[in-house]
C-alpha cells in the first residue's frame, strides 16, 4: 500500500474494501506479445513455432516450376541489427527496421527417361537478402519515416459457420427462413438457405443459387445415401394379416398407436389406439417380446421409400428410392411377395420433408453431372469438361492453398457441430486425423489399412497380390499381427513404394494432409516401419511421396463437415438448435499487429511466387543461384504500403501518456476486411452482454464511429486464437478461492458469475443466501451454492481511461464517455500535479505507458543531473557480459506527434537505493510516477456576473501568474537545400537585399542561434536559390563584365516563421550528404554530441574501476604479503610477510594491485587476476561500443535523392491559459475560459482565501454527472487535511500527535505500521509533501460512500455539507446563500485558441476563381455565404457588401486599383467584373450556350 523510494512516492488513502487478487496485465502487452509471436526473433528456425512469419514462409515454399524439375525450398530466416537506433530514426526521418536474410535451397531434379523415377541432381543453398522488416519499439510502436505510428488491432468476424434467420422479412408471408454461412479465413464463402417453399439451396461466393443436393452429390454421395443420412427410416413388415413396423424407441416416442397393441400370448392391451407411446410402454413391449407394432394400411400411403424396393423374383425395381407410396404401388409390392421394405420417417411436425423435396426437385443424378453443374454456375460461358470441373471443385474448399479456415475456424466448426477433427485441418470436408500418439503400434496401421471407408486402404489393397489380400482380410483386427504376416506386409508395401506407378494417380482428391510432418515422420519411423529403413529413405528423398505415406493415418470421417453443416441447418428448421448472434464476442475475434502483418507478408510472398515460377520456366534453372530467382521487392512494397497507408496504421496519438496507452489498446471494426461506417447498423455498434470485462462499454468516439471503435477493458487480454479473455476467480463448492483463470466469451457461457463486490466472509463464503450474478447475458439472483465464478475487481468492466474517473458510478454514461475521451486530449503542463482524488490507476498507467524512466536493475544512484542518471548496479545482478553500470539518458524537450513537449525530470537523488521497476524519472504529465493530466483547483459552484453562462469558465488570474496551466509546445520546421536544374541551392547567411537587423540571429552558416526569440516573418534558415537566366541588354552585359557578378541571379527562399507562432529556438539539427563539406554549425553540433558520448564512456569506466578497486581491497586487506610490495618508482611500501592495509593500497593503481602476491593457497591471487581480467574485458567492450557510436556520428547522412543539406529547427512556444482555451473535468464537464479575473475580484472565503475557478451550477443537474460534485467534496476534505497538517507543522506539534492524526486519516493498518516506523526526518518529508493535500483513491464502482466523504470533511474541520459562505471580491459583501466549494481536478485540453485564431488581409488566391483560399493552413480568408449576404442586405450596408463581393474577393483589376487608391490617399471605389463571373460564362459556353457580355457606355 505504501511506497517509499527515498520517501518521495505518494501515499494514497484508498476506499476500496476488495483486496487485490491479480495485478492488471501490462497495458501494452497486446501489441508487444502479438509482434513477438509474429517475429520469433530469438529462436532459430528449427525451434520456431509454425506461427507468424515462419508459418507464411512454410506455407508458400517450396516453389516448384511448372515441369517440377526444380524446387525452391525455404530453410530459415534471420534478422540482423538495425542500422539506426530509435532516436536516430526520429531525427533523420528513417524507418526503424532490421535487415532480414532468408536461407533458401534450390533443388534440381533429374527424371529418368525410361523408369520415370526422380532423383536429386543438384542442391544449392544460399542466404538471400529479403528487404527490411520494421521492428517494434519497447513501447509497442513503430517508427516509420521518422514518425511514431501504432497498428490498431482489428475486431472482425471470426471464421467458422454461422446460422441465422431473416426474422420473417424476406417473404411476404412472414415465414422465417433459415440460412447458414461458412466463412473461411481466406477462400470461397459457402451459403445454405431455405426459400419459402422449404427447398434448401446453396450459393458459392454469393453466385446464383442451386439446390444444395447438387453440392452434396458432387462430394460423391448418392441420393439414397443422403436420404438415409438425414432421415431415420422404419421397416414395414407385410408378412402378417395387417402390416406392422419395427420398434425404434427414438421414433416411436414421437407417435401415437394407430390400433391397439396387444400381447399375443396373454391378449393384454399394452397400448390403446390413439394413445402416445411412452418410454414405459415401449419397455413393456420389449419385455413381452413384441417385435413389431401393428399399423393401418392408410398410414403407409403417402410416405416415401428410403431405398429401392426390388421384386425378389425378377430383380425389377418396384418402388424407387424417395418415391411416394400410392395405393396401386402398395398393392403391387404386396402382390409380388415382398416381405418388408423401409420408409422414411417424416411426420411434418418434428421432422419436415424439406430435404426430401429438395432431392426430388434436383434433376441431377450423378456425381459427374453435379461437378459440371457447379462449374457452369461459377464459370458461365466456359465450356465445362469433367477434368476442369473436378479441378475447380477440388480447389474451392479442399485445397489448403486456396482455402483456409484457420485454426480458429476449425475450432469454431468443431465446437458448433460437435466434430472431432484435428485442429491442423483447415479445409472443409476434412478427414478425421489420428494424432501421432494414436499410431501406437503396427497393429494400429493394420487396423487403418483394413478400414473399409479409407480411400488409401482401398487404393493400396487394389495394388497388392489378390491371394495376399485374402489372407489380410481374414485377419481379425482386434488380434495382434503375427510376425510372418507383418514381414510379408512390409515386403509388399516396400515393393509398392519402389513402384513409380504407385504415385501416378490423383491419389487424395478431397483429402487434406496435415502440415505437421515432423510428428508423423517420427511416429512412422519409430513405431510403424521400425524394421524397414528403405521406406524412410525413399520418403526422405521425395516430400510428395512422404505426404502420400501420411495416408495410413488418414481415415475419412463418416461425419463430413458439409453434411454436418446441412444437418444442423435442417435441425434448426425443425426447431432444434439455436441461431448465432454475430455480435457475440465468441463470434468476433481480434487481429492484432502480428496477424495483420502476417497477412500482408502472405500477399507479398504469393506475388513473389508467381515471379519466381515465371523465371524458372524462362531460364535454365541449372545455371541459376537462388538469389537470381528471388526478388524481394514485391514483399517490401506490400509491407511498406501497409505501414504507410493502411487504415489500421495510424499516426500515434501522443498528446499525453494516457492517449498513447489507449491508442495501443484500441479495437477497430473498420479497416480492410472489416465494416464500413456507412453500412454498419445499430446492432454492431451496441453494447453486448459478452463485452463485460472484455470491451469497455463507455469509451468509444462520439460521431460516425460510435461503437465501431472500442477499447479493451483493464484486465482483458487476447488469447492465441484472437478471442478476448477476462479473468475470474474460481468458486468451488460455494467457497471463493484465490485461483484466477481467464475465460473467453464462449467458455464463460452458462456459468453463474458473481459480482466482485458480493459480500464474502473471512473464509471466502458468500454472506447472503442469494447473490446477484450474471448467466448467459442475463442478470439473475442465484443461490450461493450455484455460483461458479466471480469477477476479480469492479474495474474489470471498464477501460483504462474510464477507470481513471473517480465516482464514475455516479455519472451518466454519455458524460462518462466524454470524460474518458477528453482525458486523452489533456495537454501536459509545465508543472504536473497528480490528482488529490484519484482512482489508484494513475501509477499503473504512468508506468506501463513507457513515458517515465524505469530502473532496469537494483542499484544505487551514482550521479544525477537534468539530462542523465547513472546507477551503479548491485553486484548480485551483474552478469558476465554486463558492465555493472546503467546510464539513463533522459529525453529533454523533445517534440511529440501532437507538438506537445516530452521531457524527463529525475525524481531520485545521489545515494538513493533503487529497485528494479522503480520510477526514477518522471515523463510528461507524470508526477512522482503517477499520471498527472491537470491541476487540483479550488472551485466554487455559483453564477458570477454572467461570465459562466452556458459552460463558460471564470478563472482567477492567479492560475496564470503561477503558471499552473502553462504548457510548452514544440514546432519543427525543416529547410532543404536541393540540387536544381539551374544549380545548387545554398544555405548561407549571405542573403541579397536584407538588412543587418533581419540577419542578426543567424550564424555564419545561415542557421539561427539557439535561444533566439522569434516572431512571425523572422528568418530561421537563410537559403538562396539560383534564378532562371534572363536575356540581358547589351548595356547590362557591359556593366556585368566590368563590375563582376551581381546578386541578381539568385532569389531569397529562406525558411521563415509562419504567422501565429512566437517562441524560442531550442534546437537545430543539420544533416549533410555523405562526402559533402561540413559547415561550422554541423561541426559544433557533432563536437557537443561527441563530448556527451565521451563523458558517458568515462563515467562508465570510472564506476566499474571503482567497483573493481572495492573488490580488490576486500580481497587483499588483512592478507600477508608473500613478496615485498614496491610502488612504480621502486620505493618500498610494505615488506614481505607484512599484513596489507587500506592505507598501503591507497597509492596503488589497479595494475599494481594485480602484481601483489599473497601467502595463502593461491586462491586470492586467482581471484585478483579474475577481477582484473573482467575489468579489462568490460573496458574494452565499453570503448568499442562508444567508438562505433562516434564513427556513426562522423559519417554523413543518407538523404533523399537530390538533397544536399537538410536543416531542422525546433521552436518552443510557451502557452499560458487565456480566454478561449477549452478546459474540462474528468466527468464530461467541459467549458471555455470566458474571462480571467484579477485575484482580488474573485469570491473569497472567511479566512480570505480566494477560489480559483467559478463554475456554473446549472451544468450539473441536466447532465447528470453528479460524480463531479462528490469529487469536489472529497477533494475539499483532502485539501483541508493538508491545511491542518500545515497548521500543525507551523505550531511545531509533537511527532506523536502528527503520527496519530495521520493514522486517523489513513485508517489502514498497513499504513499505520509504515507511519510508526518513520523517524523525525522522514515524517517531516512526508508531512511537507502532504501540505498540498492528502491524495485519495476512490476506485470506480467501489468509491467513497457519502458517509465516508462526510467523515473525511469532519477530519478536515469542515462542515459536512461541504458548503461555505463566500464574499464578493469586488464589494466585500457576503453572497446570499452558502456555496459548494471544493477541489476539482481540471484539465487544459488540446483545443487551444492560439491554434484556431487566424487573421488575413491579403494572401493566396485560388487559380480559377481568383477568390481567397479558405482555412488557417492555407492562410485563407473568411467566407461570406448566402446567409451572411442576406444579413448585410438587411442592414442596408450596400457599400460594405459591394466591397466584400468584389475588390476583397475576386475582382482582380479592382484589387490593384484599390491598392493604388490607398497608396495615393484617394478614397474612391471602382468595382470591376468579378472573376467568378467569367468562370460562369465559360461554364455556360461549355454547355454550348452562346453567352456574351455586352459592354456599352452609360447612356
Swiss-Prot record:
Q: Which reaction does it catalyse?
A: RNA(n) + a ribonucleoside 5'-triphosphate = RNA(n+1) + diphosphate
Q: Give the enzyme's EC designation.
A: 2.7.7.6
EC class of this enzyme? transferase
Task: Tell me the SUPFAM superfamilies matching this sequence.
Answer: beta and beta-prime subunits of DNA dependent RNA-polymerase
Transcription as a keyword of this entry, yes or no, is: yes
**Molecular functions (GO terms):** DNA binding; DNA-directed RNA polymerase activity; ribonucleoside binding
**Keywords annotated in UniProt:** DNA-directed RNA polymerase, Nucleotidyltransferase, Transcription, Transferase
Please name one Pfam family that this protein belongs to.
RNA_pol_Rpb2_6
Q: Would I find Transcription among this entry's keywords?
A: yes
A biological process from GO: DNA-templated transcription
Question: What GO cellular component entries does it have?
Answer: DNA-directed RNA polymerase complex
Question: What does this protein do, in the record's words?
Answer: DNA-dependent RNA polymerase catalyzes the transcription of DNA into RNA using the four ribonucleoside triphosphates as substrates.
Q: Which family does it belong to?
A: Belongs to the RNA polymerase beta chain family.
Subunit text: The RNAP catalytic core consists of 2 alpha, 1 beta, 1 beta' and 1 omega subunit. When a sigma factor is associated with the core the holoenzyme is formed, which can initiate transcription.
Q: Supply the HAMAP family for this chain.
A: RNApol_bact_RpoB
The molecule here is called DNA-directed RNA polymerase subunit beta
Q: Which organism is it from?
A: Pelobacter propionicus (strain DSM 2379 / NBRC 103807 / OttBd1)
